[in-house]
Each structure stands twice: as C-alpha cells, then as structure tokens.
Amino acid sequence: MSLTELTGNPRHDQLLMLIAERGYMNIDELANLLDVSTQTVRRDIRKLSEQGLITRHHGGAGRASSVVNTAFEQREVSQTEEKKAIAEAVADYIPDGSTIFITIGTTVEHVARALLNHNHLRIITNSLRVAHILYHNPRFEVMVPGGTLRSHNSGIIGPSAASFVADFRADYLVTSVGAIESDGALMEFDVNEANVVKTMMAHARNILLVADHTKYHASAAVEIGNVAQVTALFTDELPPAALKSRLQDSQIEIILPQEDA
C-alpha cells in the first residue's frame, strides 16, 4: 500500500503512522524523525487535528479517538493475509527445540501465533503481548525480563531488560524494524527499544528479519545494525534494487512467501 493512502501527503501519513504506533509523540521527537522544523510539525499537527485525524496536546499530539484508528485498522486488515503468510514462513524456518528471542511489534505477534504448533521452544521476549500469545502452550518455556513497561505496545525496556537478555544465547532472533535504508542500515524509532534489540542481535546465532514492503520507504532515527548481520529476510515484496544487491552480496536469504502458500 502506498504511503500517501491516508491523506495524499507522504509526510502527513508518516506522522500519522508514528502516532498510531506510539500513541503520543512530542513535537521535538516528530521534528527529528521527520527531518523538518518544529514549526512545520506544529502546522502539520494543527491541520491533521482539524481533520479529526489526531488529537492536539500541549507540546505534542496523540491518537484521535476514532477516525485515525479506524483508518489504520483498515490498513492492518488489508495486510493481514500478507503478514500471516510471512509469519508462517518464519515458523516453518524454526525447528522444534529452539531457543528464540522475539522483540516487540504487531508483525512478530503474527509469528508468535504461527509458532503455537511447535514443540519444546524456549522463548525470551520483551513483549508482554507475545508472551501472552505463547504461554498457553504447555510445551513452551516463556521468559520475560524485568524493566519499564510501555503502555502503548506492552514492550519492556531499560537496562535490566537488556541485561537479562544478555544472559542467553538464542538459536534465532525474530524481529521487525522501523525502516531498512538503501545502504542496508536497520533503523528503529525508539532508542530504549533499540538497546534491547541490539543486545538480542549480539546474542543470537541466526537473525530472522520480518519486514513488509513499507519498511523499504519508511524513515526512523536509531540505527540498530545492518542487513549484513541478518540470516534471512522474510518479506512480501522484493526490496528495491540497491538494497537487494546488498543482500545478495552478503548472501542473505530473501524469503518471499505466497499468500496462498
């Protein structure tokens, strides 16, 4: 789906996506991530709030109670089959008896559901949503770290979370990202979430990157690594030429599942 599908303005759509994902963002954060001035962000917030797409707050903006959430729910539903197909491919890649890191996000939550028929998995995750999906399987051992709990995505962050993760060596890391740059940089929005992901990357034997096509054109501020570190990219569309070339040069497997597979 195109990034201009909601408003016809790519920057406005990116601002809406950030707020939909995070729940609330202040003006300085938005200016930094969108690479514009704070004055531009204030104008954008004013315009979008007048359209009922977000709610203005002192120093920032948050989700609207209905319109923007409905728009993003429709976007999510339209991509559900794609995400399910990607998730099934990831689950097929992981054998029974594995130790797995799983990060935060709606995409990896699909992977968690796809793993439910596996046996004897040990899962370390900093997502309470992922843990809640997986703990029902009595054949799984599910572990979560201590730390600071984020209300908008049920993620656990902070030094204690990273320290807990560092005590393990996982067979696989399943993670998504905020954006993939054309030079192969893997980017995230939040520095605190990024620190936990970087620790997981350093302690995983195989990194399985789950990213739909929108990540090729997104923008985020915090670099967590490079595609050269990845074992396999699971996606719904082939990457742009420059990124595809980097993946091939690094012998990274690109897995492109069919929706009806």
Curated annotation (Swiss-Prot):
Induction and repression of expression: Negatively autoregulated.
GO molecular function: cis-regulatory region sequence-specific DNA binding; DNA binding; DNA-binding transcription factor activity; ligand-modulated transcription factor activity
Alphabetized Gene3D superfamilies for the sequence: 4-hydroxybutyrate coenzyme like domains (3.30.750.70), Winged helix-like DNA-binding domain superfamily/Winged helix DNA-binding domain (1.10.10.10)
Source superkingdom: Bacteria
Keywords, alphabetical: DNA-binding, Repressor, Transcription, Transcription regulation
The entry's DNA-binding region: 25-44
GO terms of biological process kind: negative regulation of DNA-templated transcription initiation; regulation of DNA-templated transcription
Alphabetized SUPFAM superfamilies for the sequence: NagB/RpiA/CoA transferase-like, Winged helix' DNA-binding domain
Entry-linked CDD domains: HTH_ARSR
Quaternary structure note: Monomer in the absence of DNA. Exhibits a high level of cooperativity once it is bound to its target DNA.
UniProt name for this protein: HTH-type transcriptional repressor CsqR
Species of the source: Escherichia coli (strain K12)
Originating gene: csqR
